[in-house]
Curated annotation (Swiss-Prot):
One of its GO terms (biological process) is fructose 6-phosphate metabolic process. ATP binds at residues 11, 72-73, 102-105. Its main location: cytoplasm. PANTHER family: ATP-DEPENDENT 6-PHOSPHOFRUCTOKINASE, PHOSPHOFRUCTOKINASE. It comes from the Bacteria. Substrate binds at residues 125-127, 162, 169-171, 222, 243, 249-252. The gene is pfkA. Pathway: Carbohydrate degradation; glycolysis; D-glyceraldehyde 3-phosphate and glycerone phosphate from D-glucose: step 3/4. This is ATP-dependent 6-phosphofructokinase.
Amino acid sequence: MKRIGVLTSGGDSPGMNAAIRAVVRKAIFHDIEVYGIYHGYAGLISGHIEKLELGSVGDIIHRGGTKLYTARCPEFKDPEVRLKGIEQLKKHGIEGLVVIGGDGSYQGAKKLTEQGFPCVGVPGTIDNDIPGTDFTIGFDTALNTVIDAIDKIRDTATSHERTYVIEVMGRHAGDIALWAGLADGAETILIPEEEYDMEDVIARLKRGSERGKKHSIIVVAEGVGSAIDIGKHIEEATNFDTRVTVLGHVQRGGSPSAQDRVLASRLGARAVELLIAGKGGRCVGIQDNKLVDHDIIEALAQKHTIDKDMYQLSKELSI
């Protein structure tokens, strides 16, 4: 293999630049040329492809976002559109592709693989919802961003004796909410994977108030429903002074944590190794702190699951 491509797709996550850097430097170390594909699959279709050198990825390991930009490209689901992308890859002499992104990005890589073009997926999403890996690139940074925000909100919640409902990202996965809620001692954590009884939530808040608790923190993953509606329901049912904070896209930004930089470097380099070995159609991950790779088609057939023990622990510690 003499030439590979790399792209980032879907929602950005802190650490993507570190992964790009690792792909480029690992490949060049093995005398392989690297081409960056800008704006994800949309740039692949349009041919926005440029050669990357060592200097192209200098001074980016500590930067959030993605140097290659990103975009969503629903039209890539069309086989004819994907063929245009493959034509662009072949036009530039690219023999293998590293795709950094989340579930949708993996779906694109899977489809390209099924159409005969070797791809390796690298998990880049703050949601931590990709099967085949314990952690995704960006999750740790986003988690620390959320924890920092909740710490600050707790200060003002204490001062004003208020209940705060804090919405975090996670349409289908509650990892951010669960980990942040446990780390910050939230009174209640609501996630898409677990059903909840609003009356039970209210009863828990009332019990806390009866024993002298002056404030409460409720962490809600966006996939559960409207945090605003939940806040209104709580205030009406308890008469507690209640506020709602939606953290939004601040969770996707910022300089990546040390953990995300190291994880991205390891996974990006491993993706190149797989392409060199002729092992396309794979996705890389980290499990028990060891690098692993899986068939991308088989990985996508799996379902992300929440850590049930951690969820139970969060309930036991929030009594």
